[in-house]
C-alpha cells in the first residue's frame, strides 16, 4: 500500500504561448526534492514533451520506503539527473542522458535498456497511467 500523503510540497509554473507549453515542476517527497522542466509544442503533428529532471535525496531509503520498496544497503545520498523526450501519441521515450551521483553516466546500451523497461512497464497504457504509483514502483524494482 502507498501512503496517501506521498507528496509533501508541490509547485508548478506553466507558460502557454503560440501552441507551446513551457513548464517547471518542483515537489518533495520525504525531504527528497524533485524538479522537472521542459516544453512541448502542441502544434506539431507528433508533439514531443522534452524534459530535464532531477531528484536530490539525502536518504534514498526514506524515499524508497514511500514507494513500499525496502533496500538492504545503508541510507545514501541520491543525485539523479535524467533528460530526454516523450512521444505521447506513439508512447515512446527517448533518453538523452542519465547521471547518478556524478559517478555513473549511462552508456548508450544502458539508455536503450532503460527506454525498453520504461516503455514496457510504465508507458504500456495511456499517457496518464505513467503517473501511477504502482507502475513507478514496478519500474524502480525492474531497473534496480
Indicate residue ranges for each PLM-predicted region:
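Small-residue helix/turn framework positions
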Residues: 1-143
Amino acid at each position: 500500500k502507498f501512503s496517501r500523503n506521498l507528496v509533501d510540497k508541490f509547485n508548478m509554473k506553466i507558460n502557454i504561448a503560440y501552441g507551446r507549453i513551457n513548464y517547471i515542476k518542483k515537489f518533495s517527497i520525504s525531504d527528497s526534492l524533485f524538479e522537472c522542466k521542459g516544453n512541448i509544442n502542441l502544434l506539431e503533428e507528433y508533439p514531443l514533451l522534452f524534459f530535464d529532471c532531477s531528484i536530490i535525496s539525502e536518504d534514498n531509503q526514506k524515499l524508497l520506503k514511500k514507494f513500499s520498496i525496502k533496500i538492504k544497503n545503508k541510507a545514501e545520498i541520491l543525485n539523479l539527473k535524467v533528460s530526454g523526450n516523450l512521444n505521447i501519441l506513439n508512447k515512446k521515450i527517448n533518453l538523452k542522458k542519465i547521471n547518478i551521483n556524478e559517478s555513473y553516466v549511462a552508456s548508450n546500451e544502458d539508455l536503450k535498456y532503460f527506454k525498453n523497461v520504461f516503455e514496457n512497464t510504465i508507458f504500456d497504457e495511456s499517457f496518464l497511467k505513467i503517473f501511477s504509483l504502482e507502475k513507478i514502483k514496478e519500474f524502480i524494482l525492474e531497473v534496480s
